[in-house]
A protein has these predicted regions:
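Active-site-adjacent pocket-lining segments in enzyme domains
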Residues: 1-99
Protein backbone atom coordinates (compact mmCIF):
# COMPACT_ATOMS: atom_id res chain seq x y z
CA UNK A 1 0.00 0.00 0.00
CA UNK A 2 2.70 2.63 0.82
CA UNK A 3 4.29 1.93 -2.56
CA UNK A 4 1.05 2.93 -4.30
CA UNK A 5 0.37 5.94 -2.05
CA UNK A 6 3.86 7.35 -2.58
CA UNK A 7 3.07 7.70 -6.29
CA UNK A 8 -0.11 9.70 -5.75
CA UNK A 9 0.52 13.46 -6.15
CA UNK A 10 -2.46 14.33 -3.94
CA UNK A 11 -1.14 12.19 -1.09
CA UNK A 12 2.33 13.72 -1.39
CA UNK A 13 0.93 17.25 -1.40
CA UNK A 14 -1.14 16.48 1.72
CA UNK A 15 1.94 15.16 3.53
CA UNK A 16 3.94 18.24 2.49
CA UNK A 17 1.17 20.56 3.67
CA UNK A 18 0.98 18.79 7.05
CA UNK A 19 4.76 18.88 7.48
CA UNK A 20 5.01 22.57 6.53
CA UNK A 21 2.14 23.45 8.90
CA UNK A 22 3.83 21.41 11.66
CA UNK A 23 0.85 19.07 11.88
CA UNK A 24 1.30 15.45 12.87
CA UNK A 25 2.98 13.23 10.27
CA UNK A 26 3.14 9.59 11.41
CA UNK A 27 4.45 6.48 9.66
CA UNK A 28 4.91 2.86 10.69
CA UNK A 29 6.81 0.09 8.91
CA UNK A 30 7.10 0.97 5.18
CA UNK A 31 4.91 4.07 5.57
CA UNK A 32 8.09 6.16 5.69
CA UNK A 33 8.31 5.72 1.92
CA UNK A 34 5.46 8.21 1.57
CA UNK A 35 7.29 10.87 3.61
CA UNK A 36 10.47 10.15 1.62
CA UNK A 37 8.65 10.73 -1.67
CA UNK A 38 7.07 13.88 -0.24
CA UNK A 39 10.56 15.13 0.63
CA UNK A 40 9.79 15.94 4.27
CA UNK A 41 12.29 13.77 6.18
CA UNK A 42 15.56 15.66 5.56
CA UNK A 43 17.19 16.21 8.97
CA UNK A 44 14.36 14.45 10.83
CA UNK A 45 15.09 11.64 13.32
CA UNK A 46 13.07 8.58 12.22
CA UNK A 47 12.76 4.83 12.31
CA UNK A 48 10.94 2.39 10.07
CA UNK A 49 11.13 -1.10 8.66
CA UNK A 50 14.74 -2.24 8.39
CA UNK A 51 14.00 -2.80 4.69
CA UNK A 52 13.71 0.97 4.09
CA UNK A 53 16.59 2.09 6.35
CA UNK A 54 18.85 2.91 3.38
CA UNK A 55 16.02 4.81 1.66
CA UNK A 56 15.46 6.88 4.80
CA UNK A 57 19.16 7.67 5.20
CA UNK A 58 19.53 8.48 1.49
CA UNK A 59 16.57 10.88 1.82
CA UNK A 60 18.46 12.78 4.53
CA UNK A 61 16.69 11.34 7.56
CA UNK A 62 18.57 10.49 10.73
CA UNK A 63 17.99 6.76 11.33
CA UNK A 64 17.40 5.35 14.82
CA UNK A 65 16.68 1.70 15.57
CA UNK A 66 13.97 2.17 18.21
CA UNK A 67 10.35 1.06 18.64
CA UNK A 68 9.21 4.66 18.17
CA UNK A 69 10.92 7.95 17.35
CA UNK A 70 9.23 11.29 18.01
CA UNK A 71 10.91 14.32 16.44
CA UNK A 72 8.70 17.37 16.86
CA UNK A 73 5.53 16.62 14.83
CA UNK A 74 7.01 13.53 13.14
CA UNK A 75 6.32 10.10 14.66
CA UNK A 76 7.71 6.88 13.22
CA UNK A 77 7.81 3.25 14.22
CA UNK A 78 9.47 0.09 12.88
CA UNK A 79 6.80 -2.60 12.68
CA UNK A 80 3.30 -3.61 13.78
CA UNK A 81 4.71 -5.23 16.94
CA UNK A 82 5.76 -1.69 18.01
CA UNK A 83 2.17 -0.43 17.73
CA UNK A 84 1.70 0.27 21.49
CA UNK A 85 4.81 2.49 21.50
CA UNK A 86 3.73 4.07 18.20
CA UNK A 87 0.34 5.00 19.67
CA UNK A 88 1.98 6.51 22.76
CA UNK A 89 4.32 8.47 20.48
CA UNK A 90 1.39 9.83 18.49
CA UNK A 91 -0.36 10.94 21.69
CA UNK A 92 2.86 12.57 22.90
CA UNK A 93 3.32 14.44 19.62
CA UNK A 94 -0.32 15.50 19.52
CA UNK A 95 0.09 17.12 22.92
CA UNK A 96 2.74 19.41 21.40
CA UNK A 97 1.35 19.95 17.88
CA UNK A 98 -0.23 23.32 17.09
CA UNK A 99 -3.78 23.42 15.68
Amino acid sequence: MPDKLRRDPKVLELVREFAEAEKLVAAICHGGWIAISAGVYRGVRVTGSLGIKDDLVNAGAIWEDAPVVVDRHFVSSRKPADLPDFCRGILSAMAGVRE
